[in-house]
């Protein structure tokens, strides 16, 4: 800021800029001085402190002044300092200096940069110049300033970055890349973009054209791991082995314990060791041959115990597999993939490709690479009533094997027998043909625990007094099996399914069954009939039935049982037809009176009896059963369970008449019950009144006795109160007198005890005070005696220690010294005084010497 003062005092190490307004030239005035401003001059700013650069610091001045060889400032013809415009000057530690007009402090005082060990500065030349060694440096050149040291900045050089050394530890390597053609630290020539590893342990400072990519850690290898590598290009590894581009190989712990992947190596992964136990084997696909190449399409079987690494390109077929250990009940079905021979010596057997054979245990078997294990077979244990279906694959013939443990041969397979869906459903149902025969539909359906094994022989347990028909479609014949029996189906046999009617009234095909119950049993049906007078009725009839079979060994007779598929429906229809025909010829009243006889004769029919009528003719009588000759079904009895009108009006009228009869009967019973209840109520009321009168008389007697007792009690009470009051007053006076006497006696005793206690206390206090005083006096006397002894002993020991000569010298030392001092002065003095001022001549010598009366100099306070 310009100042208008005429006199400017410039302190030391300060300066100002003065502008000559006539010539427009500025100059510098440096203190210490007092500057007188001229009229044509102008001071541009107040005194400013000079620029001081301390040691190990620097600053940058823009547009610096030009200097000659003697470092003197150059001026032009006008007297203005000559500047190097657009230039810079780096000034280090020196004496304080001013800034000339036009100079600018571009960078303030800054400490010099200290480059530490393992550190370097990346420098780049901005201009062409010659260094201090005389070497030419071209613009764009780059180099490093490595520590330790202090970097002196130059205006032609730019600091690009600070480079830190990278510490390489054990099992590590530094990956570098060349930014341009250069020589590495080992003096090896590198081309642009080339990468390499530095494996030496310690701090590594990359060169100026070396770029650090990353720090590569070594892969630690053990006995159980290997490193899978692939070559990125043709190169030789550290062991001198040449690798081609794309080649893959393994590095194991036998090669090195820790492997640092090279720049030309690509790590594909860590391969674990494959360990086979004594009961294991594996099949290696595309195994590696002696030439180090994979044999594509080949296989190699390796059996344990063994440990190995899978080479690149190798893979396991189905992993590690267990050796087949076969027992006596086990076998292996094998298939030859290639021609081979098995066995030794005379037992050697040749197999062609595609052959199948079976080997049986007990043995251990490891299949070769030319053999495929089709399946492992187990002997199928079969009980006496169990079996399987076996088919010969060569002939196609199917047979059933029942009752013994069986193992399939190489040409046999299990055959699945298919059954109709209806038969499957009936076999899977859990209801008993006998116990569940009365249930509707398929109630009590039990879900099977598992699906039926179709290779097992189909068997069915025929219950007691039942029959099952099995039909052989190949032989075209049927056989009937009677229960209790277990029937098993041959491969070509099927069950005959019965489709029976069920329900009320009977519905066809409502129930299906595999077995035919032979009875005796019953079934119920509902039929509608019409009488001669057109009354429609609904009957519910139950029939007892059974099958009559004379010879079960006769095939023709047994086949008749299944000749009628629905014997229930056919029998019910036939019987209903007979009943309708019989009822249609009688009126309702006749049928109502003789319904059982009419129905029985209609069902069973009638025959001539031996009894004769009035006219001598034989009388008809009802048979006791009805026989169906087609299948031998016998109906032995019939039960009429209900008869109901079908017409609604008739049914309502019948119900009303029944209700009216019931109501009349109910009303009569109600009236009789009501009359009986009234009679019983009258009797109870009379008994109650009589009991009340008796209770009142008893209460009056009790009241009389109570009043007498109250009067007696009041008399006794008045007499007792007066007597008790007098006795209590006399007793109170007596007790009060005795208490006064006792109180006076106790007070006298207490006063005597109190007086004696006080006297005893005072006596003991006086005795204790006397003892205390005597002990205190004795202690004082003892103390005084001991102090006197101590003083005497002290004085005695002091005199003995000083000795008689020393004591005498101390006694005469003062006077002798005074005499000698006066003699040494040689003064003769005259003393004139009057009698009113007595003078102590004994202390005169002390006063002259400046001593006190005791011969000691005065103490300075």
From Swiss-Prot:
GO terms for cellular component: cytoskeleton; cytosol; nucleus; perinuclear region of cytoplasm; ribonucleoprotein complex. It holds the Pfam family Vault_3. Coiled coil: none annotated. InterPro entries: Band_7/SPFH_dom_sf, MVP, MVP_rep_dom, MVP_rep_sf, MVP_shoulder, Vault_2, Vault_2_sf, Vault_3. Phosphorylated on Tyr residues after EGF stimulation. The gene is Mvp. It is found in: Cytoplasm; Nucleus. The vault ribonucleoprotein particle is a huge (400 A x 670 A) cage structure of 12.9 MDa. It consists of a dimer of half-vaults, with each half-vault comprising 39 identical major vault protein (MVP) chains, PARP4 and one or more vault RNAs (vRNAs). Interacts with PTEN and activated MAPK1. The phosphorylated protein interacts with the SH2 domains of PTPN11 and SRC. Interacts with APEX1. May interact with ZNF540. Interacts with TEP1. GO terms for biological process: cell population proliferation; ERBB signaling pathway; negative regulation of epidermal growth factor receptor signaling pathway; protein activation cascade. This is Major vault protein. It comes from Mus musculus (Mouse).
């Amino acid at each position: 800021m310009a100042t208008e003062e005429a006199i400017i005092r410039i302190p030391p190490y300060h300066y100002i800029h003065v502008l000559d307004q006539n010539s427009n030239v500025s100059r510098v005035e440096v203190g210490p001085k007092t500057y007188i401003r001229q009229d044509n001059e102008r001071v541009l700013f107040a005194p400013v402190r000079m620029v001081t650069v301390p040691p190990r610091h620097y600053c940058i001045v823009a547009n610096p002044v030009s200097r000659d060889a003697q470092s003197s400032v150059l001026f032009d013809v006008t007297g203005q300092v000559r500047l190097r415009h657009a230039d810079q000057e780096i000034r280090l530690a020196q004496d304080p200096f001013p800034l000339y007009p036009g100079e600018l402090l571009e960078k303030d005082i800054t400490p010099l940069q200290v480059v530490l060990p393992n550190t370097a500065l990346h420098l780049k030349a901005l201009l062409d110049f010659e260094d201090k060694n005389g070497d030419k440096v071209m613009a764009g050149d780059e180099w490093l300033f490595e520590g330790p040291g202090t970097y002196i900045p130059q205006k032609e050089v730019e600091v690009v970055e600070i480079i830190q050394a990278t510490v390489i530890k054990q099992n590590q390597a530094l990956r570098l890349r060349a930014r341009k053609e250069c020589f590495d630290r080992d003096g090896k020539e590198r081309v642009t973009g080339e990468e390499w590893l530095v494996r030496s342990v310690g701090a590594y400072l990359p060169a100026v054209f070396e770029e650090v990519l990353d720090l590569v850690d070594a892969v630690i290898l053990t006995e159980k791991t290997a490193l899978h590598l692939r070559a990125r290009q043709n190169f030789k590894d550290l062991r001198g082995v040449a690798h081609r581009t794309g080649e893959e190989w393994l590095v194991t712990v036998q090669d090195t314990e820790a492997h640092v992947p090279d720049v030309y190596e690509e790590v594909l992964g860590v391969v674990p060791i494959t360990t086979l136990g004594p009961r294991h084997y594996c099949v290696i696909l595309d195994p590696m041959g002696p030439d180090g190449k994979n044999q594509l399409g080949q296989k190699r079987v390796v059996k344990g115990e063994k440990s190995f690494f899978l080479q690149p390109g190798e893979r396991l077929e189905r992993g590690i597999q267990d050796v087949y250990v076969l027992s006596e009940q086990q076998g292996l079905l094998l298939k030859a993939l290639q021609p081979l021979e098995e066995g030794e010596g005379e037992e050697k057997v040749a197999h062609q490709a595609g052959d199948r054979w079976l080997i049986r245990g007990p043995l251990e078997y490891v299949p070769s690479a030319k053999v495929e294990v089709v399946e492992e077979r187990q002997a199928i244990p079969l009980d006496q009533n169990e079996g399987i279906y076996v088919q010969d694959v060569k002939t196609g013939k199917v047979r059933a094997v029942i009752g013994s443990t069986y193992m399939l041969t190489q040409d046999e397979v299990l055959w699945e027998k298919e059954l109709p869906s209806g038969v499957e459903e009936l076999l899977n149902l859990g209801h008993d043909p006998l116990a569940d025969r009365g249930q509707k539909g398929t109630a009590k359906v039990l879900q099977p625990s598992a699906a039926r094994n179709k290779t097992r022989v189909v068997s069915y347990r025929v219950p007691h007094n039942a029959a099952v028909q099995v039909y052989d479609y190949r032989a075209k014949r049927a056989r009937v099996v009677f229960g209790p029996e277990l029937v098993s189906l041959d491969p070509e046999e099927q069950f005959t399914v019965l489709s029976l009617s069920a329900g009320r009234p009977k519905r066809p095909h409502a129930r299906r069954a595999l077995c035919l119950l032979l009875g005796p049993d019953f079934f119920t049906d509902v039929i509608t009939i019409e009488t001669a007078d057109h009354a429609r009725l609904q009957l519910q009839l139950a029939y007892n039935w059974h099958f009559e079979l004379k010879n079960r060994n006769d095939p023709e007779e047994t086949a008749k049982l299944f000749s009628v598929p629905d014997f229930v429906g056919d029998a019910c229809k036939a019987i209903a037809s007979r009943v309708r025909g019989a009822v249609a010829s009688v009126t309702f009243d006749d049928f109502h009176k003789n319904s059982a006889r009419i129905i029985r004769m209609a069902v069973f029919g009638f025959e001539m009896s031996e009894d004769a009528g009035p006219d001598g003719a034989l009388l008809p009588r009802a048979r006791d059963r009805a026989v169906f000759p087609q299948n031998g079904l016998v109906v032995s009895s019939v039960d009429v369970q209900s008869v109901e009108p079908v017409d609604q009006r008739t049914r309502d009228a019948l119900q009303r008449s029944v209700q009216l009869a019931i109501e009349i009967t109910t009303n009569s019973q109600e009236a009789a019950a009501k009359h009986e209840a009234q009679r019983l109520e009258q009797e109870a009321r009379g008994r109650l009144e009589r009991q009340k009168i008796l209770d009142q008389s008893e209460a009056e007697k009790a009241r009389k006795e109570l009043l007498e007792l109250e009067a007696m009690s009041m008399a006794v009470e008045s007499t007792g109160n007066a007597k008790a009051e007098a006795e209590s007053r006399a007793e109170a006076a007596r007790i009060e007198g005795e208490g006064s006497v006792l109180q006076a006696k106790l007070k006298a005793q207490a006063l005597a005890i109190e007086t004696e206690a006080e006297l005893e206390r005072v006596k003991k206090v006086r005795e204790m005070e006397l003892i205390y005083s005597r002990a205190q006096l004795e202690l004082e006397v003892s103390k005084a005696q001991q102090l006197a002894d101590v003083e005497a002993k002290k004085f005695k020991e002091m005199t003995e220690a000083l000795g008689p000569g020393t004591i005498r010298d101390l006694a005469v030392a003062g006077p002798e010294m005074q005499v000698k001092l006066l003699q040494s002065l040689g003064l003769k003095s005259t003393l004139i005084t009057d009698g009113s001022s007595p003078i102590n001549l004994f202390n005169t010598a002390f006063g002259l010497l400046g001593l006190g009366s005791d011969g000691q100099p005065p103490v300075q306070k």
